Amino acid sequence: MIPRVTLREALSDPNLLGTAIAGDSWMSWRVLLIAAMGEELREDERAIFTQLTGREREPLQRIDQFAAIVGRRGGKSKAIATVATYIAGLCDHRDALVPGERGVLLCVALDQRVAKIILDYAEACFERSPILKQLIANRTADALAVC
């Protein structure tokens, strides 16, 4: 996976994902997701990262797994939909796919209701971006196809 832009850049650009998890109340999620993608944090972000994880430094490489204890209405679905949109729409996967193969971003959830919520959030991320909106090929009840 080769990012076309960093997650930080995407989350800062209103033409990409800048409106997805904007505002002060989403700062913790932005910090965790940026760190999870292996990007370096600023000092103010590192303080938040340390407070949330107990770690002094971010990993500086993309992580394979992310686990967090987050209560109800803690923003999990919207945050995961945002990073899923980033991975599906703003990263190049030619290094992992053979010509003609289509990538699939699988979102596993507690049940179909929660999976649909995440899919709806991801679709909204694509739709709100004039750039990402162009990537939508098809939407069905349980899938969002992008090209």
What are these regions (language model features)?
Residues 1-147:
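Phosphate/NTP-binding elements of NTP-utilizing enzymes
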